[in-house]
Every structure is written in C-alpha cells, then in structure tokens.
C-alpha cells in the first residue's frame, strides 16, 4: 500500500530516529517532513509501533494510506518530483 508520512518533531535527535525508522521501511523523502513509501499492512503496523516507541508528547506524526484511485489523481506542482522510480509505480 502507498503511504505518505508527515511529521513535526521538536528535537533533532527524535527527528533523526523517526527518519531512520522510515528509511528502514523503504520510505523516501519527498519534502522536509514528508516521506512516501510502499509497504504491506503488517509492515505499516510494525513501522507505526516503532514510531510510537520513539516519539514524545509534543511530536506529531500523520500516516496517510493512499488508495489506487486517489494515487491515480496525484498532481505535482512546483519542483518536479519524479514518479518514474519503481517506488512510485502504480500498484
């Protein structure tokens, strides 16, 4: 499943831990605090568990699953992001 992860992390060390977790699960950076990945349901839950163990009460993280229909409607404005990469291929 395609997933966007957006976060606001107060301290750099916590942010580095979250980024490390996202990279471990194959997520790639799209913007400063926005990552995109393609994971199975069990991987998503494992990733969310790892993240929950490493965030603080003042941090916020949003995971957004993207269905095939919504992914097909994706628009990119401004700086061009390449969706030709294998990670971004449609289901």
From Swiss-Prot:
Binding site for Mg(2+): 10
Positions of transmembrane segments: none
Disulfide bonds: none
Gene Ontology terms, MF aspect: metal ion binding; RNA endonuclease activity
EC number: 3.1.-.-
Gene Ontology terms: biological process: defense response to virus; maintenance of CRISPR repeat elements
Needed co-factor(s): Mg(2+)
Domain of life of the organism encoding this protein: Archaea
SUPFAM superfamilies per the UniProt record, alphabetical: TTP0101/SSO1404-like
Protein keywords: Antiviral defense, Endonuclease, Hydrolase, Magnesium, Metal-binding, Nuclease
Subunit structure: Homodimer, forms a heterotetramer with a Cas1 homodimer.
Function of the molecule: CRISPR (clustered regularly interspaced short palindromic repeat), is an adaptive immune system that provides protection against mobile genetic elements (viruses, transposable elements and conjugative plasmids). CRISPR clusters contain sequences complementary to antecedent mobile elements and target invading nucleic acids. CRISPR clusters are transcribed and processed into CRISPR RNA (crRNA). Functions as a ssRNA-specific endoribonuclease. Involved in the integration of spacer DNA into the CRISPR cassette.
Family of the protein in this entry: Belongs to the CRISPR-associated endoribonuclease Cas2 protein family.
Name the record gives this protein: CRISPR-associated endoribonuclease Cas2
Organism listed in the record: Methanobrevibacter ruminantium (strain ATCC 35063 / DSM 1093 / JCM 13430 / OCM 146 / M1)
